[in-house]
C-alpha cells in the first residue's frame, strides 16, 4: 500500500511538473499575448500587467523545481495549490462579471475555447489533485526504480490526457461549425 501511495505521489508530481512547465513555456514564448490575457481578466491595474506577465512563468518554474526536489515536494505542491486556487478564483471572478475570455492564459491549447465551466472544473480538479499530492508527499518511502518509472509514466500519460481533453474542448466549437454545414 505504501508503495502505491508513493507511485501516486510521483505521478502527481510528474503531472504538475510537466503541466506547469508547459504553461510557463507558453507564457514565456509570447509574453505580449499573456499580458493581453491578464488585461482581459480586468483584475490587475495597468501598471501591474507587464510585471505579472514576466513574473508568473518564473513562479511556475520555481514551483516545478520545488516539486521535483524530494525535500521540498510538499511545499511545491502546496504552492501549486495556491497558484491553481488563484487561477480558479480569477476565472470565477471574470465569469461572474460576465467578461468573456477567449484564452485563460494557461497553456495555449485552449486558446480557441471561451473560458467557462470546463476551465472552472479543470482548475478545481487541479486544486484537489495538488492537495492530494502534497498529502501523499508525506507518505513517500524508498521505492524501486520500476515504481519511479511507473509513477513518471502515469504522470506523463495523465498530462497527455489533460492536454488532449483541452484540445478536444477547444475544437468543439470548430467541429460543431463543420458538422452544421454538412
Predicted ranges, named:
Residues 2-182:
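Membrane-interfacial helix-loop segments of redox and metal-homeostasis proteins
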Amino acid at each position: 500500500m505504501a508503495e502505491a501511495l508513493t507511485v501516486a505521489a510521483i505521478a502527481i508530481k510528474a503531472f504538475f511538473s510537466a503541466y506547469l512547465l508547459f504553461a510557463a513555456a507558453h507564457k514565456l514564448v509570447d509574453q505580449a499575448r499573456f499580458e493581453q490575457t491578464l488585461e482581459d481578466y480586468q483584475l490587475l491595474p495597468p501598471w501591474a500587467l507587464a510585471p505579472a506577465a514576466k513574473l508568473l512563468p518564473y513562479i511556475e518554474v520555481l514551483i516545478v523545481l520545488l516539486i521535483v526536489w524530494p525535500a521540498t515536494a510538499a511545499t511545491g505542491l502546496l504552492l501549486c495549490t495556491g497558484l491553481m486556487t488563484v487561477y480558479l478564483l480569477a476565472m470565477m471572478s471574470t465569469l461572474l462579471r460576465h467578461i468573456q475570455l477567449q484564452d485563460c492564459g494557461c497553456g495555449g491549447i485552449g486558446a480557441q475555447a471561451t473560458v467557462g465551466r470546463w476551465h472552472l472544473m479543470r482548475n478545481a480538479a487541479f486544486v484537489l489533485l495538488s492537495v492530494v499530492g502534497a498529502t501523499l508527499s508525506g507518505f513517500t518511502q524508498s521505492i524501486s526504480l520500476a515504481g519511479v518509472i511507473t509513477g513518471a509514466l502515469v504522470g506523463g500519460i495523465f498530462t497527455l490526457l489533460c492536454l488532449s481533453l483541452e484540445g478536444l474542448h477547444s475544437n468543439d466549437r470548430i467541429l460543431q461549425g463543420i458538422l452544421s454545414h454538412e
